């Protein structure tokens, strides 16, 4: 049997040897096609190898599949379930890839963490805020710092 490996090491395309036909892990029918797919040490028809979340076909040439926790997933669903967008600049905790975030320059924040770091006033989309020394500040705290001579202007 010939097996071609994908980048992530998951065997994908096999040429079925003459003789005993393999059973499809998706539909449980015999695979009579010359080509079959192999993922998670199981064999699949091209049409039966699908993402466990969104049912998109993964058997097409050029498709990439991801496996984790015995699930077969497309790239989008793998990142949605298991990916991260980095760490929150305020609390330093991981931010899951599917979670909505706020951004200020190169910093990424959980929605709940996007607040003035002096008075804890939360910001909404469109609110004016200031970024000074990687600190997010509301207008009142920023202006107070300006009056005291603490800050240079860095309006976002």
Swiss-Prot record:
One of the protein's GO biological processes: positive regulation of transcription by RNA polymerase II
Family annotation (InterPro entries): LMO_RBTN_TF, Znf_LIM
Main localization category: nucleus
Keyword Nucleus carried by entry: yes
Pfam family, one: LIM
SMART domains: LIM
Matches recorded under CDD domains: LIM1_LMO1_LMO3, LIM2_LMO1_LMO3
Residues in LIM zinc-binding domain copies: 22-84, 86-148
Subcellular location: Nucleus
Keywords: LIM domain, Metal-binding, Nucleus, Repeat, Zinc
Annotated Gene Ontology cellular component terms: nucleus
Molecular function GO labels: DNA-binding transcription factor binding; metal ion binding; transcription coactivator activity
Role played: May be involved in gene regulation within neural lineage cells potentially by direct DNA binding or by binding to other transcription factors.
Protein name: Rhombotin-1
Lineage: Eukaryota, Metazoa, Chordata, Craniata, Vertebrata
